[in-house]
Design a protein with these regions (language model features):
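Glycine-rich adenosine-cofactor-binding loop
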Residues: 36-60, 73
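Phosphate/diphosphate-binding loops
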Residues: 93-194
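Adenosine-phosphate binding glycine-rich loop
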Residues: 154-260
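Gly/Ser/Thr-rich loops at beta-strand to alpha-helix junctions
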Residues: 50-55, 76, 120, 143
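Catalytic or ion-translocation cores adjacent to nucleophile or general acid/base/metal-coordination motifs
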Residues: 56-104
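Glycine/serine-rich phosphate-binding loop and adjoining beta1-alpha1 elements at the start
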Residues: 1-42, 143-144, 154-186, 195, ...
Length: 260
């Protein structure tokens, strides 16, 4: 197969965050969470139909949120690429195999992502026959999964979450071996800058803590979160106080590079 044809179109990290924010919005009011704790969406199933950039964003968002994710795409190579990138956990050829994996993790309320190489419409029918009902559906081919929608699955719509998008990555990309510890320190500053009185702070902190695990090699080199103006200002002030850390990263605030 021509590598140019098979290469996946990957989402920007901001698109993944926005998909995550949309998913959390759908879950609002449906999960019982202690005021000081975000338990995530463990026990939920997110079904993604087609692994284009938006579908990949939904897959990663679901895993970060704590859901089990079943991604259906007719091109097996797409799932295999995501497996190589560290973005999905399993690639399977039939729904029975997917069900064996998903059933255990949904029961344990643990995140897992399974890419199924199959036709979207046929898979949706088979899911109904097997009693596999997702809480949320996403992806370009989601309209082929009408029976699942009729049975109560919500549709994850593409959109832009409120707030300024703040991104950061290593300044010296050649030193990728150092990216993890450096970016993790910036992640902590970002989490600390989030307002304690802001409703979405708990799940944004979950994002900052867990997204690196599920972004894989292709997406994990850049981090992001959406912030209110005062939060972004606090984060920049914290970076200014740590000159050694600031010198190692490039930070972009709402599309504009920040001088650190």
């Amino acid at each position: 197969m021509d590598s140019a044809k098979s290469e996946l179109a990957m989402p920007a990290v901001g698109e993944v965050f926005d998909a995550y924010a949309s998913l959390r919005g759908l879950a609002k009011g449906q999960t019982k969470v202690a005021p000081s704790h975000d338990a995530g969406l463990g026990g939920w199933l997110v079904s993604v139909f087609d692994l284009d950039a938006a579908g990949i964003a939904a897959l990663v968002a679901g895993a970060v949120a704590g859901s089990a994710v079943l991604a259906v795409d007719g091109q097996r190579e797409r799932g295999k690429q995501l497996l190589r990138y560290g973005i999905c956990d399993f690639v399977v050829n039939d729904l029975d195999e997917a069900l064996r994996i998903l059933k255990n993790e949904v029961r344990r309320k643990q995140p897992v992502s399974v890419c199924l190489s199959a036709d979207s419409e046929a898979s949706a029918r088979e899911m109904v026959e097997r009693g596999l009902q997702p809480e949320v559906m996403a992806g370009r081919n989601v309209l082929t999964a009408g029976p699942l929608r009729d049975r109560g699955a919500a549709r994850l719509e593409a959109g832009t979450a409120p707030g300024e998008l703040v991104t950061w990555k290593l300044r010296n990309e050649a030193a990728a071996w150092a990216a993890g510890p450096v970016l993790a320190r910036v992640d902590e500053l970002a989490a600390g800058a989030l307002g304690e009185d802001v409703e979405e702070t708990l799940w944004r902190r979950r994002w900052l803590q867990r997204a690196p695990r599920y972004m894989g090699r292709r997406l994990g080199a850049e981090r992001c979160v959406r912030m209110r103006d005062a939060e972004a200002t606090r984060m920049m002030a914290a970076l200014h106080k740590d000159a050694a850390l600031a010198a190692q990263v490039i930070v972009v605030r709402d599309g504009t590079p920040v001088e650190l």
